[in-house]
């Protein structure tokens, strides 16, 4: 049984904790969170932390967790501005690290994380969950295999209400704003499905204040050969539920995924009713955490979700910001590594 320490038990930390309850090979044994005493008293956590929160060792400072516990790996679910610091500390302690997306706020921090993983010779994986999302994977593999003929276009979108006034995410110096925190899901998926584009042209803005960062963006990715690819994202000061969509056109089919659909995916052919595939398997969080645990257990690198790919996802967002500010398309080679 793998012994796991979770660093940060907020919204995403609880989502990850839920996934560990579905795995036979791993168990959370320690949690670090500034609210440790408050959380330890929360009976609702018993279902997330079997055999119960009283069996968990709690820490307010993740450094104490790293120095005191006998662990096989850590799962870092802290706010974005703390990702690099915590991941590097874990790796320097000799522990494999799963880190929530985005990798970090700055490319130099991403590079420092990659360097720390190489020096420690321990796996580092960033949790870009769309790489493990069954419907998105069907879209990608259909393009690779030309299951419906050649891919012609892909439009991705996601949006939500702006985080609450008390949330650290409203401060772009801590979260990167919607363009980095929310939009990076689709940015990373584009490079996963299609590789790195040659150029990016983006439009967007800060609807409220510069402190909140770019909260709406539309980016077009140039792959040449007539392939049309775009992704958009919004934080809006309205009561908008979180939602996401993908519209993908192949020569012989149109795939439409929408978070308001059940099932999520519809496949339209030339005639007849759309196909409604029922995809088996676990949710994306469980898939990615199982993959990470397998990586740790087998002592190999996370080839499906490498640190370099996570770093380049941040680089592509930086390219979008540069395009918005310059008002012209930009070459991605300025922002990505190979």
Predicted regions and their residues:
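Hydrophobic residues in well-ordered beta-strands that form the structural core
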Residues: 99, 124-126, 231, 257
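N-terminal Rossmann-like dinucleotide-binding module
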Residues: 1-51
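Contiguous beta-strand/loop segments that form the cofactor/metal-binding neighborhood of enzyme cores
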Residues: 181, 187-264, 289-301, 336-338
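Beta-loop-alpha module in the N-terminal Rossmann-like domain of NAD(P)-dependent dehydrogenases
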Residues: 16, 54-116
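Predominantly a Rossmann-like dinucleotide-binding segment in NAD(P)-dependent oxidoreductases
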Residues: 123, 130-210, 327
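C-terminal helix-rich "cap/oligomerization" subdomain common to oxidoreductases
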Residues: 26, 73-75, 111, 122, ...
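Active-site loop of classical SDR/Rossmann-like NAD(P)-dependent oxidoreductases
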Residues: 278-290, 305
């Amino acid at each position: 049984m793998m012994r796991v320490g979770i660093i940060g038990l907020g919204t995403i930390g609880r989502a990850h904790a839920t996934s560990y309850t579905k795995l036979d090979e791993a168990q959370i044994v320690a949690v670090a969170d500034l609210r440790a005493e408050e959380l330890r008293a929360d009976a609702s956590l018993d279902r997330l932390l079997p055999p119960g929160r009283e069996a968990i060792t709690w820490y307010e400072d993740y450094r104490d967790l790293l120095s005191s516990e006998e662990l096989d790996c850590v799962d870092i679910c802290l706010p974005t501005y703390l990702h690099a610091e915590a991941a590097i500390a874990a790796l320097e302690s000799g522990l494999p690290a799963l880190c929530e997306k985005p990798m970090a706020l700055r490319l130099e921090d991403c590079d420092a994380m990659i360097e720390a993983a190489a020096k420690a010779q321990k796996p580092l994986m960033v949790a870009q969950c769309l790489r493990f999302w069954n419907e998105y994977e069907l879209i990608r593999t259909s393009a690779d295999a030309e299951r419906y003929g050649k891919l012609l276009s892909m439009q991705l979108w996601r949006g939500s209400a702006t985080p609450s006034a008390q949330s650290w995410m409203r401060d772009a110096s801590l979260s990167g704003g919607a363009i980095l925190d929310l939009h990076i899901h689709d940015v990373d998926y584009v490079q996963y499905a299609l590789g790195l584009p040659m150029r990016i042209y983006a439009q967007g803005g800060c609807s409220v204040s510069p402190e909140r960062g770019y909260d709406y963006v539309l980016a077009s990715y140039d792959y040449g050969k007539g392939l049309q690819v775009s992704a958009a994202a919004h934080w809006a000061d309205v009561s908008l539920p979180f939602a996401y969509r993908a519209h993908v056109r192949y020569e012989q089919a149109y795939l439409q995924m929408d978070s308001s659909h059940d099932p999520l995916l519809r496949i339209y052919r030339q005639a007849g009713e759309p196909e409604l595939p029922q995809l088996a398997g676990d949710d994306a969080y469980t898939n990615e955490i199982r993959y990470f645990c397998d990586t740790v257990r087998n002592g190999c690198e996370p080839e499906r979700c490498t640190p370099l790919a996570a770093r380049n996802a941040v680089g592509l967002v930086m390219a979008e910001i540069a395009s918005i500010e310059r008002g012209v398309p930009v070459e991605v080679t300025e922002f990505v590594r190979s």
